[in-house]
Regions:
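N-terminal Sec signal peptide cleavage junction
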Residues: 1-5
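Flexible, solvent-exposed loop/hinge segments and secondary-structure transition points
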Residues: 8-485
């Protein structure tokens, strides 16, 4: 008869310290080591943890363009910058995450390339963090940069190398984004573009290895999701046939020092609704309940096993205006954009006509509902089926960043998120707002969001899980089996 072992409730990381932000000298040494690691013309960029681009460096004869997502050729400098941001945004102090890792958990199958398995938990991640802005007034010292393109306007977003909207090749990857650690804390990311997969990844790794900007990965040394070990980097030695090079290029941006640590805690002042919905005290209670549950929830994406989860929490009013935005210490930075969008999505799509047909208007939906119906196969995990009923929404969002379906354009839009971690908020049967949570596994995100929505949950009779589409039951939320242990 087996025994149940309860892992210790390890605290998760603190806020980034000022001593561990990147200096100009740090940036220069990382870029120089990367550029000299291989005799291939490349574009190299460095980001700090918040997404400020600190350097863009083009080696002599660097290609003008490089492969981005969905078969798009984009300026190589832009690709390098977004690879750097992607690695910085996804890593936490307890677990390094590269763009290879992100691709692995966002393919149309998990693990990638295994037929008749459901999609990765972060399916659709490429549609996030495209530089939309949040239409907020930050508290003093708590502002975040808008991750716009170097040229201005929407950026390429999270880069994974996904080849097309149907994800016809799960093994296609852009692995040139690697996190930078300093003093055991995430300090930023390096992105390399312009070579082949092995060269880009090696040059990015070399920029961190040569200077000791590497993580101290706790036991067991690898993050495991659903029994599957997630890859970090593959190419840690110079690729066959390549030779070391020289730093023979020039900076087109920087080198700059990071302006400071990534902010945590309340990023904006908590306020009550201007739409006749949530009061300020209710907003505060929602945030505090979410934090309290997070502090009890076992993390999936942190090491060692038994660490507690960390999240970004957003609460939105009926018009999408943010009433609260809170980042727990060491919560992943990509989660800010994601939590904000989730909080807005559940409001709009729980009342929008026709956007989620054939669900009836007024059905309470979550981002789990939206993502489940937006897969290239429906239901996810059954190959050779038709795309989901909301797949056209995914395609529209992909082509139209900083929108919210076909809602009339307004400042409170930053895209649609196609993976879980949200709940619409109700006073009785009246929709009054939305909560979005991001920062760990999607089931953990759902669990913590539901805790925040306690007392404001959607009436059971109007939830999406009352309905089936094409004979397939639609989901609402899903929780871990034993979330605290």
């Amino acid at each position: 008869m087996g025994t149940t072992v309860t892992p210790p409730k390890q605290p998760s990381g603190p806020a980034q310290t000022a001593a561990n932000v990147l200096s100009v000298a740090d940036v220069q040494s990382i870029v120089t080591a990367s550029a000299a690691s291989v005799n291939v013309p490349l574009a190299i960029a460095v980001s700090d943890r918040s997404g400020n681009i600190l350097a863009v460096y083009l080696k002599a004869n660097a290609p003008a363009t490089a492969q981005a997502n969905f078969g798009v050729q984009a300026p190589a400098a832009e690709v390098a910058a977004e690879l750097a941001r992607s690695a910085a945004f996804f890593s936490n102090d307890q677990a390094p995450i590269s763009t290879r890792t992100v691709r692995f958990i966002s393919a149309s199958h998990f693990p990638p390339g295994i037929t008749n398995t459901e999609s990765g938990p972060l399916y659709g991640i490429e549609n996030t963090n495209r530089g939309c802005g949040f239409n907020v007034t930050y508290l003093p010292g708590q502002s975040l940069p808008v991750p716009m393109a170097l040229s201005g306007g929407p950026s390429l977003g999270i880069l994974t190398g996904k080849p097309d909207a149907m994800d016809s090749n799960n093994l296609a990857v852009n692995p040139g984004g690697v996190p930078i650690f300093k003093g055991g804390e995430v300090a930023g990311g390096i992105g390399v573009a312009g070579g082949d997969e092995a060269t880009d990844e090696y040059a990015a790794v070399a920029g961190t290895l040569a200077n000791g900007f590497v993580p101290n990965v706790p036991s067991p040394g690898v993050v495991v999701v659903g029994g599957v070990s997630l890859p970090f980097v593959n190419q840690t030695t110079i690729p066959a046939g390549e030779q070391p090079g020289t730093a023979n290029g020039s900076y087109t941006l920087g080198p700059l020092a990071s302006p400071g640590p990534a902010p945590e805690g309340d990023l904006i002042a908590e306020t009550g609704s201007t739409q006749g919905g949530l009061t300020q005290s209710e907003v505060h209670a929602i945030v505090q309940n979410t934090i309290a549950t997070a502090n009890l929830t076992r993390a999936v994406l942190r090491l060692p096993e038994g660490s507690r989860a960390r999240f970004v929490i957003a609460v939105a009013d009926l018009d999408g205006h943010l009433l609260a935005l809170y980042r727990m210490p060491d919560a992943t930075m990509f989660s800010v954009d994601v939590a904000v969008a989730k909080s807005r999505n559940v409001i709009y799509f729980s009342q929008a006509p026709d956007e989620l047909s054939p669900l009836p208007q007024g059905t309470a939906v979550t981002n789990r509902t939206i993502g489940f119906g937006a897969q290239p196969f429906f239901p996810s995990g059954i190959d050779a089926t038709l795309p989901g009923p909301f797949f056209s929404l995914f395609q529209y969002d992909l082509a139209n960043p900083c929108t919210q379906g076909h809602q009339a354009a307004n400042p409170n839009q930053n895209g649609v998120v196609f993976f879980p971690g949200a709940a619409p908020l109700y006073h009785g049967s009246q929709l009054v707002g939305g909560i979005g949570v991001s920062g760990d596994g999607v089931d953990q995100d759902d669990f913590v969001a539901a805790a925040g929505a306690n007392g404001f949950a959607a009436p059971q009779a109007i939830r999406a899980d009352n309905y089936s589409v094409r004979g397939v039951p639609m989901p609402y939320q899903k929780f871990p089996r034993d979330p605290e242990n």
